[in-house]
Amino acid sequence: MKKITKYIGSQFGNPRGIIGKVCCIIMNVINNAMYRNMVRAIKIQSDEKVLDIGYGNGYLLKKIYNKHHADLYGIDISVDMKEQATSRNIEAMKAGKLHLQVGDCCNLPYDADTFSAVSSINTIYFWSDTIKGLSEINRVLKTGKPFFNAVYTKEWLEVVLYKGRI
């Protein structure tokens, strides 16, 4: 049982294959309120750039694009998710506003002072080096611009995982 739990947990950090797709759908449902609040909080213009760390299947990116029509950038460690996020965001891609990469937030491949906003939902738990990741985000964010990081508390996760309630 421990191996199965560990395997499924790893899928939330690096979704791959059919199980990874299912995990992303579950995340889309569980994180829906976070997505809505994140989109509402991000205040950008269509000529600005936003970076989403851990874009998964592109669900949040699509919501951001639908509201702001901004340039969308994303970095995720999952090759499979790049494919899914690209197909989910065809409209932004056709407009030349979708720029997805496979990689790690601890080594962001962007110039300093590039983004007007950076978002991340429930990914910080999986970063290889939290301090380095935060430092990289600070480097690529324009001065005074926000980093939106939404996470669940340990207590909330325990309610969901162990008591089966949301």
What are these regions (language model features)?
Residues 51-107:
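Class I SAM-dependent methyltransferase SAM/SAH-binding core
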Residues 106-117:
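A short acidic, Gly/Pro-enriched loop at the edge of an enzyme's catalytic core
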Residues 29-48:
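Conserved alpha-helix/loop element of class I SAM-dependent methyltransferases that forms part
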Residues 16-30:
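Class I SAM-dependent methyltransferase Rossmann-like catalytic core
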Residues 146-166:
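Conserved class I S-adenosyl-L-methionine
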Residues 1-19:
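N-terminal, positively charged/glycine-rich alpha-helical extensions of SAM-dependent methyltransferases
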Residues 116-129:
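A short SAM/SAH-binding and catalytic strip from SAM-dependent methyltransferases
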Residues 131-143:
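A short glycine-rich, Lys/Arg-flanked "PGG" loop and its adjoining helix->strand segment in the class I
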